[in-house]
Amino acid sequence: MTIISAEQVGNRLNDWRIAIRKHDVHNAKTIYTELKELLQEMEENQEVLTYYSLLEGKFKLMLYERRGKKLNEPTVLEYPSKTNDLIEYYFYLYKALYASYNRDYASAIGLFKIAEKKLQNIPDEIEVAEFHTKVANLYMMLRQSLISLHYIQNAIDIFKGHDGYERRLAAAFVIAATNFMDIGDFKRAENYYTKALHISNQLNDHFLASQLYHNISILYAEAGESKKCIDALEKALSDDDYLSSCYFEHSMFMLLKELLSIDEKSQALYYFELVKQKQEIDRNPIYTAKMNFLYHLFFTEDISKKAQTCFDDISILKELKDVEGARELSALAAKHFEELGSIHQAYLFLKDAYQLEHTTLNWRNYDEKSEFTHFRFSHRCFRTNGVLQFVK
């Protein structure tokens, strides 16, 4: 058997890295298959294997962002004994991204800060833009909008100056839009979404368009425009690939919530049946609890039973460490019971939402707490942008 040099494999790894950071799914998958064969025939080289392991993590995250592929538990990596600047940077970046994915936000922030120092030794503008995008996404999730906008504007400026990174520019536009939405500037938020949708149309990328329609539906929900929100969600759910991804659950939860908010119960029941059929094949405990909550809140007649079952569903989210989701549903229940005139139950859910907000604050250190945006109830679901998660 012919032994392949580590340099040859390393060169192909660089090709893979470029495909991954461009979010070129087809090419990245092709190179991934090729690399698995090359590694079987490569001479022993720990540095190349470490580089491959770290890029594989980025590859899986890309598939999660672009196609909604589920992430498995990450391989635990020891600190590489022999590294160069790029591998050392990837090491901390990879760990930061997984810490964020697992909702360990305090650790993620610390690891991102270490990675940022390592990044100073890497003269690569696109790598800088990618890093700023990921950090901006984290601060966006933590509602630190001004910090997030600082990072994402840097990324936008870089991506605009390089051809071939239109998808990454669209992802950056989404993060900017979300931050402007969080500070109540709906017009600027909509403008950024319009720019991102224009890119998806130019690329003829229907999956990306579905992700964008989901995210813009959140903007319309925040602005109290339920019909526009529902229209955007139905457009998101019109793509077959999107329907088979994990993002389906995000959009369906949002769609059901908006339909019920305008008392379209018959249409909501139709979608509940679709969700039930899909959950028989692929069950997600977080979204099962969320769907059950919506059904109990709007279809259970007895007030006491309604309140108890909703508290039970929220407790499941707490056990699964979905604090943001639990807070959102507590706020939604408080509003619903207030409208029914059940002030005591409304108070209990309002109190729960307030306590969950302080649980959220505990993710941050003291300095970050002082910068956190003022608490307000926000009936949002999770976004489909993981840059995670964010269009991706």
Show where each model-derived region lies.
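Alpha-helical scaffold segments of alpha-solenoid architecture
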Residues: 178, 191, 195-304
